[in-house]
């Protein structure tokens, strides 16, 4: 199932196949703000959605 998130860098909507998500975590930027990172089998995606929203969407399809 595809999940849609907003890419933090481009502000574009990005589709991510839930089957390929490995882990979701938060990381601090250079300015100290926290961003949510989705790690997939092909790389990382930094998104603008809150951590609990991302995890909630992922849990809904599992």
Predicted feature descriptions by range:
Residues 2-62:
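Acidic, Ser/Thr- and proline-rich intrinsically disordered linker/docking segments
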